[in-house]
Amino acid sequence: MATNESVSIFSSASLAVEYVDSLLPENPLQEPFKNAWNYMLNNYTKFQIATWGSLIVHEALYFSFCLPGFLFQFIPYMKKYKIQKDKPETWENQWKCFKVLLFNHFCIQLPLICGTYYFTEYFNIPYDWERMPRWYFLLARCFGCAVIEDTWHYFMHRLLHHKRIYKYIHKVHHEFQAPFGMEAEYAHPLETLILGTGFFIGIVLLCDHVILLWAWVTIRLLETIDVHSGYDIPLNPLNLIPFYAGSRHHDFHHMNFIGNYASTFTWWDRIFGTDSQYHAYYEKKKKFEKKTE
């Protein structure tokens, strides 16, 4: 009975979304995107698309999303949004981070990306435009990937903080007590593999088109660079997402080294009480600010 009710609710919700979608004006970018997509399919092999296409998407998005935070350090007005104001970025740290990123991206992540083609072939994942999912199904699957990744990240991240293994792996990521956007993927190679597994679990379970790979990469990079940005920007649209952790939540993890282990959402930290020091810190800070007003 419960299963039938769940299916009925899902079907009703799906029909409602489809109805709303039918009322929306036609997307003027759809035709150019369709032409570009078909051009790609006609001029490149699936291996080239899945491997080199995925690498280009990752690198272009990663450094594009890092750019605003990088520029903020040169804009005096933005300093008031810096979370740890006493720890500005340094050229030395950023250059060190950039070099490690290049190694991780091309020596660790690229071999993993090469497996994307074989994954799509084994599971018969389509590439063609005709079978590309509607935007609402794509968003729903990306949300599912985010929930899965966040769950994996919370427990594996917490494990990496265990006193017996922290200094061997996760300590690398904590070299910079005040994070900055480019540091999001600054990590020990083993950590890249361990925490990165959470990214792929959702893909294996939910992928129904190669576009999901790139959509999920886009959302995951946007989120992880945002929480590592070191800035709490007002009117950040990501903060509209229910239970979204945000930059202040993860910045405290880097400052305190303990607690706030989740990557995207706040529920696991809330359930296991690993956000208690975070809330106590900001309550104390609010009281102090009121006294000094």
Curated annotation (Swiss-Prot):
Keywords: Cholesterol biosynthesis, Cholesterol metabolism, Endoplasmic reticulum, Iron, Lipid biosynthesis, Lipid metabolism, Membrane, NAD, Oxidoreductase, Steroid biosynthesis, Steroid metabolism, Sterol biosynthesis, Sterol metabolism, Transmembrane, Transmembrane helix, Ubl conjugation. Belongs to the sterol desaturase family. Coiled coil: none annotated. A motif (Histidine box-1) lies at residues 157-161. Its EC number is 1.14.18.9. Ubiquitinated by MARCHF6, leading to proteasomal degradation. The gene is MSMO1. The histidine box domains may contain the active site and/or be involved in metal ion binding. It is a multi-pass membrane protein. It catalyses: 4,4-dimethyl-5alpha-cholest-7-en-3beta-ol + 6 Fe(II)-[cytochrome b5] + 3 O2 + 5 H(+) = 4alpha-carboxy-4beta-methyl-5alpha-cholest-7-ene-3beta-ol + 6 Fe(III)-[cytochrome b5] + 4 H2O; 4,4-dimethyl-5alpha-cholesta-8,24-dien-3beta-ol + 6 Fe(II)-[cytochrome b5] + 3 O2 + 5 H(+) = 4beta-methylzymosterol-4alpha-carboxylate + 6 Fe(III)-[cytochrome b5] + 4 H2O; 4alpha-methylzymosterol + 6 Fe(II)-[cytochrome b5] + 3 O2 + 5 H(+) = 4alpha-carboxyzymosterol + 6 Fe(III)-[cytochrome b5] + 4 H2O; 4alpha-methyl-5alpha-cholest-7-en-3beta-ol + 6 Fe(II)-[cytochrome b5] + 3 O2 + 5 H(+) = 4alpha-carboxy-5alpha-cholest-7-en-3beta-ol + 6 Fe(III)-[cytochrome b5] + 4 H2O. A motif (Histidine box-3) lies at residues 249-255. It is an enzyme of class 1 (oxidoreductase). Catalyzes the three-step monooxygenation required for the demethylation of 4,4-dimethyl and 4alpha-methylsterols, which can be subsequently metabolized to cholesterol. Residues 145-274 form the Fatty acid hydroxylase domain. It is found in: Endoplasmic reticulum membrane. GO terms for cellular component: endoplasmic reticulum membrane. This is Methylsterol monooxygenase 1.
